């Protein structure tokens, strides 16, 4: 069983929670990494201490129910811990699943960096399906209150995040963006006299080659720049931007970092879909705990690769992701605390959760 005191010391230096909350956080993070699932029954079954699993489970429930978690402090902690520097590429997307017939729907904002997105802010949508404009604007406004407009390089998001009011908000706030259009959305043609389906503007161009249309075009009431590409499978990737740039398609590709993040939180990491928590605020807090564990694993991976870089395969990708590399190492150390060398290694890993 891990001695959590080194982890408690590190957490006290970096968060403003009281001693009891820090003790709980340390126990929860260690247990979460050990069991590789956010299922609270399994987490409580391995939490350190003399209490029975039922007592640990009730303690988790009390934390989720009563603790007013400082989400703004957590967002700043993530940025400082990973060492992210503005201006940021902001990604926004949604992930959903079902618990029986109950839809669980998370709208999340993160910072794209190093091929992944680091989660900062999120909200739980009490419905199934897409987010609406008001929900997106609220999330962006929460971000702006914390970090300001000047901290944003641009926002990138998929086809769900298109709409008249949404584009008007981004343009009004002076926030740059790279957003993907649905290929049947109407866009001005080259003569500016007629609106046609966006795909028709790229139908005759060679597959796999990005084309930036000349001049801004009217898109949902805004004058925007449009770049697109016809893929070899016949699908179109069409991006609109508030700025003219030959890099629009490349910029938009950074959106995939948030898909990688969702994979880490779900099947490749902490099995988010295994939770039975459905209450909006409790699920939001549970995600916060998972984000801390995710960042710890990622920092561990960064630290490991400084001394021993990951191999690159023939296709140009890493043999293992930095997150997975760190997560596997962290779990091995935490699951073998009977060994003196592993206890010493755990003390070193605890220091990786420090921003100083």
Task: Go through the PLM ranges and name each one.
Residues 1-37, 46-49, 67, 74-75, ...:
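Single, function-defining residue in the core of a domain
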Residues 78-80:
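Short, compositionally biased leader-like segments
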Residues 53-66:
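Major-groove recognition helix of helix-turn-helix-like DNA-binding domains
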Residues 40:
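Helix-turn-helix DNA-binding elements, focusing on the entry/boundary residues of the two helices
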Residues 93-106:
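An active-site-proximal beta-strand-loop segment
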């Amino acid at each position: 069983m891990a001695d959590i005191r080194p982890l408690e010391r590190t957490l006290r230096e970096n968060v403003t929670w009281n001693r009891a909350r820090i003790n709980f956080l340390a126990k929860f993070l260690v247990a979460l990494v050990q069991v590789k699932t956010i299922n609270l029954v399994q987490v409580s079954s391995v939490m350190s201490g003399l209490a029975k699993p039922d007592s640990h489970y009730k303690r988790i429930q009390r934390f989720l129910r009563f603790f007013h978690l400082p989400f703004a402090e957590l967002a700043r902690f993530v940025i400082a811990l990973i060492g992210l520097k503005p201006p940021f590429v902001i990604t926004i997307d949604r992930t959903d699943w079902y618990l029986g017939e109950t839809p669980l729907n998370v709208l999340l904002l993160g910072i794209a960096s190093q091929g992944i997105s680091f989660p900062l802010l999120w909200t739980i949508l009490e419905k199934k399906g897409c987010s609406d404009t008001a929900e997106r604007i609220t999330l962006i406004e929460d971000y702006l209150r914390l970090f300001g407009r000047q901290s944003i390089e641009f926002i990138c998001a998929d086809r769900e995040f298109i709409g008249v009011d949404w584009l008007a908000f981004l343009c009004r706030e002076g926030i740059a963006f790279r957003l993907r259009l649905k290929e049947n959305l109407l866009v001005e043609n080259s003569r500016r006299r007629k609106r046609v389906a966006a795909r028709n503007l790229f139908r005759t161009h060679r597959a796999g080659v990005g084309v930036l249309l000349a001049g801004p075009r009217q898109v949902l009431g805004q004058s925007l720049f449009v770049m697109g590409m016809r893929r070899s499978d016949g699908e179109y990737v069409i991006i609109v931007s508030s700025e003219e740039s030959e890099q629009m398609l490349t910029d938009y590709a950074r959106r995939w970092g948030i898909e990688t993040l969702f994979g880490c939180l779900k099947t490749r990491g902490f099995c988010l879909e295994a939770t039975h928590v459905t209450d909006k605020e409790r699920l939001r807090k549970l995600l916060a705990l998972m984000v801390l564990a995710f960042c710890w694993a990622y920092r561990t991976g960064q630290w490991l690769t400084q001394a021993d870089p990951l191999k690159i395969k023939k296709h140009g990708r890493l043999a293992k992701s930095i997150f997975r590399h760190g997560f596997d190492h962290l779990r091995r150390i935490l699951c073998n605390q009977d060994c003196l060398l592993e206890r010493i290694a755990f003390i070193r890993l605890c220091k990786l959760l420090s921003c100083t």
